[in-house]
A protein has these predicted regions:
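Intrinsically disordered regulatory tails of 7TM GPCRs
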Residues: 1-29, 314-353
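Cytoplasm-facing ends of alpha-helical transmembrane segments in multi-pass membrane proteins
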Residues: 53-64, 88-92, 118-142, 157-159, ...
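Intracellular effector-coupling site of seven-transmembrane GPCRs
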Residues: 158, 188-203, 207-214, 227-266, ...
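Extracellular TM2-ECL1-early TM3 structural module of rhodopsin-like
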Residues: 37-43, 72-130, 137-148
């Protein structure tokens, strides 16, 4: 029979949990963070699910029905909304499992982990692609960059991004298992029987992978493009459509990094706490609490992007009003044909979502 070492200190759903049960280590008393989250998470996740489902649905509707997918930016925005929906679909199950316990079998655990992880990793990749695309729209007109702005290129890069997101999720499926009869940890990571009890390389690898894809790659792309943007922004006016696109895309990336960055940092410190001399009970308890709290906060991000579009993009607000106006002639207007748009006019579509 497989001899799994359970990892009890953290996370109800996805990514990494540590291992406090290694032999020879000090057994530390539990704090009340998990109990508190068990009361907060169900209501919070249910609210986020309802809000996120509604606003991401409107985002998809506006992109497909009104703006069309004739621009690479709109293709990336559509995939970004789909990524958020993948993540959103798991929240009611985590909320129910956290409040009732004993409801997740192993197949359901794997399905939820897959949706959650693929949604998160793909969102990080599409944020990076949007930053790169907005930079190309702003400053490059050569034939190579013009080819990169064509729809076939957008479709190919989207397929590749989804493929990468699925590939980096596969290792997590090997280590996740359900835990029946608990309200706190319905789905967690465990060490497979074929690894020795002292082998923590699998946990380190998963943490590094998560930090690399979700934090470091988007942060690197954002930093490079933002520095280049600051060096050349004087060539753009504040009312330029290209400037509006960049403002929206950079705002989306900043919010993503602010909400997911703390979780990735806390996760890294928790996993490598022995290397940072943070293995004592007090530090370990603080790290466990930080990972749990930052994870819950980060999970609410999946409903934020459409709200940013409403705040920052006039075209999105206009089309949203068209969607809500019953019987209006404007709402029945077919998607715009990019073949008849002038280059500057086409950028209006790029800023809509």
């Amino acid at each position: 029979m497989a001899n799994h070492t359970l990892a009890p200190e953290e996370d109800y759903d996805v990514l990494i949990v540590g291992d406090l049960n290694n032999s020879g280590t000090e057994q530390c008393p539990r704090d009340d963070a998990t109990v508190l989250l068990a009361h907060v998470v169900p209501q919070l996740y249910t609210t986020v699910f309802l809000v996120g489902l509604l606003d991401n649905f409107w985002a998809v509707l506006i992109l497909v029905k009104y703006k069309g997918l004739g621009h690479v930016e709109n293709i990336y925005f559509l995939n970004l909304a789909i990524s958020n929906l993948c993540f959103l679909l798991t929240l009611p199950f985590w909320a129910h499992a956290t409040s009732h316990g004993g409801t997740l079998g192993h197949p359901m655990c794997i399905i939820l982990v897959t949706l959650s992880s693929v949604g998160l990793h793909s969102e990080a990749l599409f944020n990076a692609l949007l930053i790169l695309q907005s930079y190309l729209v702003l400053f490059h007109v050569s034939s190579f960059f013009s080819a990169a702005r064509k729809v076939p290129c957008g479709i190919i890069t989207s397929v590749l991004a989804w493929g990468v997101a699925i590939l980096v999720t596969l290792p997590e499926l090997l280590f996740h298992k359900s835990r029946v009869g608990t309200q706190q940890y319905p789905c967690l990571l465990s060490r497979p029987h074929f690894l020795s009890g002292k082998d923590t390389s699998w946990e380190h690898s998963l943490t590094v992978k998560t930090n690399l894809v979700v934090l470091l790659v988007p942060l690197l792309v954002f930093t490079v493009c933002f520095v280049l943007f600051l060096r050349t922004r004087k060539t753009l006016g504040s009312g330029d459509r290209k400037y509006d696109l960049a403002k929206l895309v950079f705002a989306i990336m900043v919010v993503f990094l602010l909400m997911w960055g703390p979780y990735n940092v806390a996760l890294f410190l928790s996993t490598f706490k022995k290397f940072f001399s943070l293995s004592d009970c007090r530090s370990g308890s603080a790290l466990d609490r930080s990972v749990q709290v930052t994870r819950v906060i980060a999970s609410t991000h999946c409903c934020v992007n459409p709200l940013l579009c409403v705040l920052l993009d006039e075209a999105f607000r206009r089309h949203l009003c068209c969607c809500c106006r019953l019987g209006g002639d404007t709402a029945r207007r077919p998607p715009e044909d990019p073949a008849h748009d002038r280059p500057r006019e086409g950028l209006e579509q790029s800023t809509s979502v």
